[in-house]
């Protein structure tokens, strides 16, 4: 398989006269040059090369005035116009000069574009009559590096070939012609322009098959897979390890039009794969990050294609490709079985863990409310509720002890460790400090372990882990305050009370266990992160600027005895027994406190008579009131109202995401990690594979009420809703039920049906 990374074999080229271009190489470009432009000529900047001069000895090589001499400009002009008659004599010229069409003399300097690429770029009604003659001439010249597989060599278009261009031009005729003449169908276009990064780019999976699929050309896809010359492989991967299915997931953008096209192409490729290579599970192929197409959709936040893969249901010959099976239905009521492979947190790097901790999309909360994730997380939550409330009770007891100890703090002069004559209260106070220290160490280790496991996605953790960051700060303050307490440093007390305040604020973390308080907590978090932080940033800038200005003006005070129009700036020193009148704004802190009163509407514009520039001070105070009290506060209120309204539509799903994070944290908790994980669902037979082997899946039952598509007739696995008696149900053959295993009753159909 030819790859763009394989360097061509070295060959000494020939020169028969003055070559176009120069030896300068443009190194200052940060943008990709155009592959073909009617407004810009071909680049003449070539890399310096050593060549054999055929005119070194008189009589060798053609004359400079030879009318049959083919240079790059002449050749590019002929192929761009599509006039094959003007290629007459090209083969003889190449043989006479020992040249090939892939030599640097016939390629563009900046991109390495060949005459064949030039011809494909200038198709007329999908054809160019010069393509076949060029291929024949190149083959007859004995080129060791065939023109049909020549690639661009610059950093932006590296690996780009004529086959890629033909597919991009949507010319099936050209694709067939190139493949019939030996084009490599697995060549990779791996330049910067074809990689996913910020800026102008188009990532399609590098391979010709992926390009055809991403540009919605099913006829080209079919030909590449079924042609008799060199069929493309659905298992082929690009430099990132992505298959054509991964590439389709990457180009999805959640819009209705794009999603419909991507889903149709995705399903068609799966069905084609089932016919061509029935033993290969295309959706189980992982890229270099260990992600299948389903996991990649979860990580990138491609909601629509993610929904389709989870809920895909086929009938007939392609039923083994389904991930959803209708077990039983009656009118709009439907009992569905969802395949849990790669979904449940029982597996490593599962879809649930990716959505909760590794997803980059700001809309990932919309994925946890999709079935079967919604019911799966609810089942896990119901099983882990006792553990959640046990953690809540332990934390509440810890905070009560913390509060009692902080409330009964002795004077700073007393020693931290009581003497032998200490009272019972002093001993209990010391015990309380020890318990606080141990609790702080436990919280600190837990939060450090939380962020260490997410060190590769630390930015996502900081954006979403609101309470985890507060818990970390609380633990640091707690441990530091207790250390300072035992070394008898008085600064332990401010740190202690700060940790106490944070501790009670962090009690809101456990409100996510209840729907109403959890949604309310979500709104508070969003308002703080979106609006309040921006307001504080702008407000602190205003506050500092005006505070410095007022402090500077307050230093210029007038003597009380001097007339108001006096120009002197020196004040009389107070006599003995006479107190000096304080200036209104003696320092930045005092000025900031006074200005804060104006912000909340409690300030007074009255000021002492000794201020020299009273008019300027008055104008500054009025400007400050207008900018903060009138403008900033009202903008904050308006933005908070808008945030609450926008979050209200997604607050339920955001709360579900927070519950999912809590569920996974409890499953992966430090003290529970050694216990065997619970595996949801049941192992059952859902059909028969093409080779006659029973199709057994680990499935999860979900009851649904769907009035939108209830008239659609789907094959069912059972005639009645009784799940315990249907054929194909069996326990896990590899293990016996344990404490964490679900009982038979846990998997019976739910009694309460909820409409979605």
UniProtKB/Swiss-Prot annotation:
User: Might you name a Gene Ontology BP term for this protein?
Assistant: positive regulation of axon extension
Q: Which residues are glycosylated?
A: 567
Phosphoserine: which positions carry it? 15, 77, 743, 755
Q: Where found in the cell?
A: Cell membrane; Cytoplasm; Melanosome
Biased composition, Polar residues: where in the chain? Answer: 732-741
Q: How does it assemble?
A: Homotetramer. Interacts with a cAMP-dependent protein kinase type II regulatory subunit (PRKAR2A or PRKAR2B) and ACBD3. Interacts with SLC50A1; the interaction probably occurs intracellularly and depends on TRPV2 N-glycosylation.
- Residues in the Extracellular compartment per record: 409-428, 477-490
What is the annotated tissue distribution of the protein whose record heads this document?
Answer: Abundantly expressed in spleen, placenta, skeleton muscle, lung and brain.
Q: What the entry says about post-translational processing?
A: N-glycosylated. Phosphorylated by PKA.
What residue ranges lie in the Cytoplasmic compartment?
A: 1-387, 450-455, 512-532, 638-756
- Extract one GO molecular function annotation from the record: monoatomic cation channel activity
Would the keyword Cell membrane be found if you checked this record's keyword annotation? yes
Q: Where are the ANK repeats?
A: 68-110, 111-157, 158-203, 204-239, 240-288, 289-315
Q: Where is this region: Disordered?
A: 1-45, 559-583, 719-756
| Ranges where the record places region Required for interaction with SLC50A1 | 1-385
Protein keywords: ANK repeat, Calcium, Calcium channel, Calcium transport, Cell membrane, Cytoplasm, Glycoprotein, Ion channel, Ion transport, Membrane, Phosphoprotein, Repeat, Transmembrane, Transmembrane helix, Transport
Q: Which gene encodes it?
A: Trpv2
Membrane-spanning parts? 388-408, 429-449, 456-476, 491-511, 533-553, 617-637
The organism's place on the tree of life at top rank: Eukaryota
> Which named protein is this?
Transient receptor potential cation channel subfamily V member 2
Q: Which residues form a coiled coil?
A: none
């Amino acid at each position: 398989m030819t790859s763009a990374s394989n360097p061509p074999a070295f060959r000494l080229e020939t020169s028969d006269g003055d070559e176009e271009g120069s030896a300068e190489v443009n190194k200052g470009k940060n943008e990709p040059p155009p592959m073909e432009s009617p407004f810009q000529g071909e680049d003449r900047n070539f890399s310096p090369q050593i060549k054999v001069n055929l005119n070194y000895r008189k009589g060798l090589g053609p004359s400079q005035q030879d009318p049959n001499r083919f240079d790059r400009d002449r050749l590019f002009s002929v192929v761009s116009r599509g006039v094959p008659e003007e290629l007459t004599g090209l083969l003889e010229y190449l043989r006479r000069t020992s040249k090939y069409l892939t030599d640097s003399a016939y390629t563009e300097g900046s991109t390495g574009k060949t005459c064949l690429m030039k011809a494909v770029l200038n198709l007329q009604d999908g054809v160019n009559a010069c393509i076949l003659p060029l291929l024949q001439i190149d083959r007859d010249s004995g080129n060791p590096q065939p023109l049909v597989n020549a690639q661009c060599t610059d950093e932006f278009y590296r690996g780009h070939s004529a086959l890629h261009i033909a597919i991009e031009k949507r010319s099936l005729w050209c694709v067939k012609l190139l493949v019939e003449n030996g084009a490599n169908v697995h060549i990779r276009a791996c330049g910067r322009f074809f990689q996913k990064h910020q800026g102008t780019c188009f990532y399609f999976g590098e391979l010709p098959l992926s390009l055809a699929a991403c540009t919605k050309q099913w006829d080209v896809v079919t030909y590449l897979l079924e042609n008799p010359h060199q069929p493309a492989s659905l298992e082929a991967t690009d430099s990132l390890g992505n298959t054509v299915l991964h590439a389709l997931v990457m180009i999805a953008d959640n819009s209705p039009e794009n999603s419909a096209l991507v889903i149709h192409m995705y399903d068609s490729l799966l069905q084609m794969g089932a016919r061509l290579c029935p033993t290969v599970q295309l959706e189980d192929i992982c890229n270099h990050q260990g992600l299948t197409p389903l996991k990649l959709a979860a990580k990138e936040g491609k909601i629509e294609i993610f929904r389709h893969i989870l809920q895909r249901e086929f009938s007939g010959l392609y039923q083994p490709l389904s991930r959803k099976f209708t077990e039983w239905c009656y009118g709009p009521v439907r009992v569905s079985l969802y395949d849990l492979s790669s979904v449940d947190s029982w597996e490593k790097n599962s879809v649930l863990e990716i959505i909760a901790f590794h997803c980059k999309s700001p809309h990932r909360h919309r994925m946890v409310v999709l079935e079967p994730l919604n019911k799966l997380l609810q089942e896990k939550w119901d099983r882990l509720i006792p553990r959640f409330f046990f953690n809540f009770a332990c934390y509440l007891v810890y905070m009560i002890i913390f509060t009692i100890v902080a409330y009964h703090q002795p004077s700073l002069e007393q020693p931290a460790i009581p003497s032998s004559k200490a009272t019972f209260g002093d001993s209990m106070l010391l015990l309380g400090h020890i318990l606080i220290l141990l609790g702080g160490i436990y919280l600190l280790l837990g939060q450090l372990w939380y962020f260490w496991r997410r060190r590769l996605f630390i930015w996502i953790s900081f954006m979403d882990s609101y309470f985890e960051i507060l818990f970390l700060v609380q633990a640091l303050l707690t441990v530091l305050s207790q250390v300072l307490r035992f070394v008898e440093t008085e600064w332990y007390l401010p740190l202690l009370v700060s940790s106490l305040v944070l501790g009670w604020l962090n009690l809101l973390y456990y409100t996510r266990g209840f729907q109403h308080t959890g949604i309310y907590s979500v709104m508070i978090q969003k308002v703080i992160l979106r609006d309040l932080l921006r307001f504080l940033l702008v407000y602190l800038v205003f506050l500092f600027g005006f505070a410095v200005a007022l402090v500077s003006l307050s230093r210029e005070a007038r003597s009380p005895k001097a007339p108001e129009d006096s120009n002197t700036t020196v004040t009389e020193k107070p006599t003995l027994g006479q107190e000096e009148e304080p200036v209104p704004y003696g320092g930045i802190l005092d000025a900031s406190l006074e200005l804060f009163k104006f912000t909340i509407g409690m300030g007074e514009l009255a000021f002492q008579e000794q201020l020299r520039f009273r008019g300027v001070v008055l104008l500054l105070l009025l400007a400050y009131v207008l900018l903060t009290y009138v403008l900033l506060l009202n903008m904050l209120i308006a933005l908070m109202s808008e945030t609450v309204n926008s979050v209200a539509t997604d607050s339920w799903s955001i709360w579900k995401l927070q519950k999912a994070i809590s569920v996974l944290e409890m499953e992966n908790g430090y003290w529970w990690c050694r216990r065997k994980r619970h595996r949801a669902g049941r192992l059952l037979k859902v059909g028969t594979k093409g080779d006659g082997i029973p199709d057994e899946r680990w499935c999860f039952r979900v009851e649904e009420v769907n009035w939108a598509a209830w008239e659609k007739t789907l094959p069912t696995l059972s005639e009645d809703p009784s799940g315990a008696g249907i054929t194909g149900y069996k326990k896990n053959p590899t293990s016996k039920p344990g404490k964490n295993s679900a009982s038979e009753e846990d998997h019976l159909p739910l009694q309460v049906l909820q409409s979605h």
